[in-house]
Structure formats: C-alpha cells, structure tokens
Amino acid sequence: MITKWKVFNFKSIREETELDLGPLTIFAGANSSGKSTFIQSVLLVAQTLAHKVGSRSVVLNGALTSLGQFDDLKSNGGKSDQITIRCTCQPLPDQEAAIPRRSQLAPRGSSIYYGSRSNQIQEIACEMSFDADPSSSQRDLFQIQPRFFATQLSCLSRDEDNVDQKVDISIHHSSKAISEIEGAGSVSAIDDQLRASLAYAVELDENSMTEVKEDFRSAKPIGCILRHFLPERIIYAIDTIEEDASAITIALQDDGRRTGGLRRSMGREIILSEEIIAVLREVLQDTIDFDQTFKDKYRQESLFGSESETLTFRAWHERLRGLPREERLNAQQVLREHENLFDRIHSAMRTSAAPKSETHALVQARPPRLITEATWYLDNFFASSFKYLGPLRDAPKPLYPLAPAADPYDVGLRGEHTASILELHKNKKIRYISSANLKSPVIDRKMVARTLESAVIDWLQYLGVARSVKSRDMGKLGHELKVGLSDSDSTYDHDLTHVGVGVSQVLPILVMCLLADTDSTLVFEQPELHLHPKVQTLLGDFFLSMALCNKQCIVETHSEYFIDRLRFRIAAASPENELNRQVKIYFVEKPLQGSSFREVVINEYGAISDWPEGFFDQSQQQAEEILRAAAMKRKASRRNKDA
C-alpha cells in the first residue's frame, strides 16, 4: 500500500508537497484545482515501471495517461530544473492467506516474499528526479524522453528476531569523465553499456557495502545499469590482485567451500608465483613432510611441483585436498589459525606483479539483497497491483471487445474490457465483505468467499442498479453483457443499451475492485458520474469495504453524498473498530498560482471541526438562500396585504 506520496515542480504543484495516504484516500475540490495533477504523478510512475523498455527513465505518454512533453509538466516559474516524485510503500501481508506471496519478478529458485514470514519488508521509500537538461544538445529528445537525474531508494526490513535493518542506495547523474573515476580510468576495454552506466554515481550504505565485500573485498561502486529509474545492476571497480589474494585465502581457510563462486566471478585462473609459493612453504613447513607424503602417494617430486612447472592455484589446491585425512586436517588447521595469511599473500602478489600490468577490473552484479527486494516489490506493485479507472467510462454497448492478452485482470481505462474480464474470472473464488454486513450502521468486517460473479451481483443489488448480471463469450464478436432489472421482470434480461447508463458505470468499478488482490492500489476519477444520489451514497459503503479488505482506493470525487456517507459510517462505528483511521480526505484549492492540499479531518463523531470554505458547502448555502428568499417573499406579501 502507498502510505506517502511527494510531488515537487509538477504542473500546478509548484512547492514540495507530501501527503499521507490511507486505505481510502479522497481528493475533493474545485475544477482545475490540482486533484488530477496529483493522480497524474502516480500514473506517471505506474506506467513507467510497467513499460517494457527499461532504458526510458520515465514514460510521459503511455498506457495510463498522456502527459505531452517535459515542459508541459514542469511548473511555470519553478525554481528547479528537475521534477521530483517520491513514494513510500508498506507491503500489506495477506492475513487470510496460508502461503505468503512471492514476487513475480524474482528469479526462479529465489526466496523473495512479501507476507507473514521472516525478513519481511516493512517499508520502501523511493525518490526520483528527472529533467530535460536545458544545457544539452539533446534537449529536444529529452523533452519527449526526459533524462534521469537522481534516485534514492531505501528499504526497512525486520528479521526473525524482530530486529529492524535499513539499507539505502543513492544514484545521481555524474559529470565526471571516465578517466576521473577511481578504478575505471586504468581499465583498457569498456563496452558501450558499461560506458553508459558510468554516467551515474552510486553510494551504498555501510551494511550493503559489507554484503558486497563478502564477494568482492576491494569493491567500490562506480556506476549503475538502470531499469527506468531503479537500479538493475551495479558496476564495481575491483583490485584484481587483492581479489586474487582474497580468493586464495578464503579457499585455504574455508576448505574450498567458496572457491567455485569466486573463480566464476573472477573468470580466470590464478597462477602461483615464486613469491606466493615461498609464503605457503613457510606457513606449512612445520606441519608435515609434504615432499615425502607426495612421493609415497603420487610419486611426485613435491606438493609445489618442480621449479620449471607453471602451477595454478586450483591445481595446487587439489593436491592439498588430496592429502590423507589426518595430514589434510592438520594443514587446514594451521592455515585457518594463521592470522595474517591474507596480508602475506597479498604482499607477495603485489611484489610479483608485472610493473605495467592491469590491476583493476570492472564487474557488474545485482544490488545487495534488500535493495534488490525493494526494486522487485516496486516493479511488481506498480506493474501488477496498481489499477486505474478514468472518469469517462464506455457508453453501453450490445457487445464488448475481447480482453487484452497483456493483463487479463485489467478492465481498461474506460471499463471497456469489463465484460470479457467478468466472463474470464466469473467462477474465480474471491474474499470480500458482503453487502449484508453493511445494512446496519455498524459494519461487520467478516469476509466471505464466493465467486466473482456472485460478489458482483451482491453489490449490484445493494446499490439498487440491477438484480442480476450475465456475461457470455460470443467468439470473435466479443462478449455480451445482460442484466436483470427487477424481480417483476425476472423472465427477461436486457443488454446494456436497453437499460440506464448507471449499470455500465458501476460494473467496471465492482469488477475491478472485487478482482484485485490484497495490497493493491486502485485509482478512480469521479466514480459517481451518471449515478443517482442514492447510488453515490451507497458507493461510499463499497469503497469503505474495499479498504477494510486491505485494497487501497484513491478516489477523486465531486460527490457530497459520497463524503456524507463516510461521515455517517465513521460516526456509527464502535470505539474498538474506529473507521476514521481508514479514511484520508484532502480538499484541493488553488489560491494563487500553485495547488494547495488541505487535510479534512473527520472526528470519531463524524464531524468536521475545521470546515474549509468551498468544501461541499454549496448545498447548505443554497438552502440558506432559499430560506432567506422565501422569508423576504412572505414579508413582502404581508406588506401588500396590509396595504
């Protein structure tokens, strides 16, 4: 679930604005006040991470919204050249699920889960900035495909001992030439992808660097390969001599348990020089008569071979491991207890290195574990668990198009795929709060398991727009939807062109919400359009039930009936099951040149203590004016009679 969202220098949001978002978040305000601007910033991030071309830092014109070019987005008169967006997410565990959810983007065999288990992610925060680089010769290109400027990503997790650990990574555009980057200037061959990655400077926290140094002792992050604005691979500069010395030391002191992975990461054989052999001879000389042992067992001259023989560390290590068990364990004990073994081997390798040999290399690896988990969660969340339904839904049709192959859970921006999605999943079992649980003032939060079709019919009946709904696959023609309107007309169902527009407006909302997984975020603009005030009122109950099922709903609305229903439910809630923490309401206004967001707090009694001017007060003002006009008319009438 998204818990916080910050926007800066984005259209009418000129100043840095960070809002707390709840399970049900409502935006209300006058037209062109900035409600849609805030939602567009969320859509921008979602359509970017869902985009298949990872080289695009942000996708301005995509599947969810078309925003034009960079200058259309940047606030007029803004003090900064960059647009900044920050999101904070808290993964919600599915308390009803027996098996926690696994990231769909995690590699096969990995164990990255979000749910009730150890090492659970508690919070992820990601801030990204982009610009059009006005000084660049590519400014025209950057207008359509903005340039990545910076990303800051942090992840808070809790282990099985309930100990919290926080990691973070900072990536920003760098103006350094490759020759100025420590560890990269001496590398002879750099391909185009690596060269592009060195345009970004990377900083990792201390815990993450400790994890990196378990594999690469000398690693220094100097670049990054991005997928959009998230890190996919980090480029490290390593000292090859130090890494070879570390590989030898670990293999000797860990009984070879890690040599396979280190050899694979280095990708080459390590040759034992005379200086290294001298160190090993000195360390092991008092342990056992290796020469005699090998003459008896292998008929070889020595453990270290002849002076003319080129000996690789792998071959020598195999000879060492081939000793009889007692002698081998004795030698390994000596090696493990030798405190400065690495320093001596490292010094010997430095001494034996050729004067002009290349001692640095670049390696690329996934980011440290928790940072990788955070990027996978954000990718999975915005690509799969984020859905959007626009304000202008499709008009009623006799037949509806086939479902999109890319996302079989997407009803479409206008709800155009609702019929096919309902037909595809109508027998799927879902968990939801039945409408019967909301027929009393206090909501019963117990969930039931029914098919999607049954759940949709349940809420259609509660809203009073239809008695039943049936979907039918018509082959290449598409899908048909028919509804029954009343019990008296139970023998005949109608297609949506023969019933009120309200059914076609409500169905996409119901299907999209009921089919969504736990820890989804669902965004709606003006869901009340074309709906009777009574239906608008009861729609507040439906969205509240979704929030209680851990499905976050972000709603832009102009409906005072919707707001009043939420106030009633909050006032009616029992003290132990308060609802005001489930709801966040923001009143958006534009006093000067920029949008201003003001939180409207509903207390436990359903009252708004600090009522903003212009916040659904028109009907009350109109009622006062009617009473005032009526009083004046009566007064004038009495005067005329008296005259």
Q: For each predicted feature, which ranges?
A:
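P-loop NTPase switch/coupling surface
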Residues: 1-396, 447, 471-472, 570-578, ...
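Switch/communication elements of ASCE P-loop NTPase nucleotide-binding domains
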Residues: 1-93, 443-639
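Sequence-level detector for tyrosine residue identity
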Residues: 8, 113-114, 200, 236, ...
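Short, polar loop/linker segments at the starts of domains and inter-domain junctions
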Residues: 22, 99-106, 400-415, 598-604
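Short, cationic low-complexity segments
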Residues: 108-119, 409-425, 611-614
